[in-house]
Regions:
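Positively charged n-region of N-terminal signal peptides that target proteins for export
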Residues: 1-4
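Bacterial N-terminal signal peptides
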Residues: 7-17
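Intrinsically disordered, low-complexity
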Residues: 21-68, 75, 161-172
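Exported/periplasmic cell-wall-interacting domains
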Residues: 26-27, 68-71, 86-172
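Structural motif
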Residues: 38-40, 77, 108, 118
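Short beta-strand segments
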Residues: 52-54, 78, 117-119
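Generic structural signal for buried aliphatic residues
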Residues: 78-79, 159
């Protein structure tokens, strides 16, 4: 089973060319790889080396996102559709505390995720959640890491999200 997971993760790297997507956007120089196994986001250069590496939080539930509200992070190859100022955004987590200011941190990097709306990479008001499965499906970073990442990313950049071993098992 573990071999199947690693085969799947390796094949994900080939999907952009098979689907006609540009592997590394227009300049073919970098992409983002998010590992739900290692709980990391890596910005990788055109030669495969790390430019940046940050810890993340991802969806509370294991498996690939199937529907809105399932608390799962989607897996596959996506692209950045927009980068927006989220510093004024609020969110109600349904915990009785109401709308929380700063819930998304300073930016929201929206991903083009067919079939799912509102999935992206963003900051947090809850830094202790980084390294855990605590989101509704988005990828969460420390705010300072997000600010650093935003300096390097652009609309159209490829984002690959790979499953953990438990995510792969949850899909069976």
């Amino acid at each position: 089973m573990k071999q199947l997971f690693y085969l799947f993760a390796s094949l994900l790297m080939l999907i952009p060319s098979a689907c006609g997507l540009e592997l590394c956007a227009q300049e073919a120089d970098s992409l983002i790889v998010i590992s739900k196994e290692d709980m990391t986001l890596r910005l990788i250069d055109g030669q495969g080396g790390d430019i940046l590496k940050f810890p993340i939080a991802c969806g509370k539930n294991y498996g690939n996102k199937r529907k809105s509200g399932d608390m799962k992070t989607p897996e596959g190859v996506f692209s950045i559709s927009e980068i927006v100022d989220a510093s004024y955004w609020t969110h109600d987590f349904g915990d009785g505390k109401g709308e929380i200011a700063g819930a998304y941190g300073p930016f929201f990097i929206r991903l083009e995720t067919p079939g799912h709306r509102g999935i992206g990479i963003h900051g947090t008001h809850k830094p202790e959640s980084i390294g855990t499965r605590d989101t509704e499906g988005c990828i969460r970073l420390h705010n300072e890491d997000l600010c650093h990442l935003v300096e390097y990313v652009r609309v159209g950049m490829t984002v690959v999200i790979t499953p953990s071993y438990k995510d792969a098992l949850a899909g069976q």
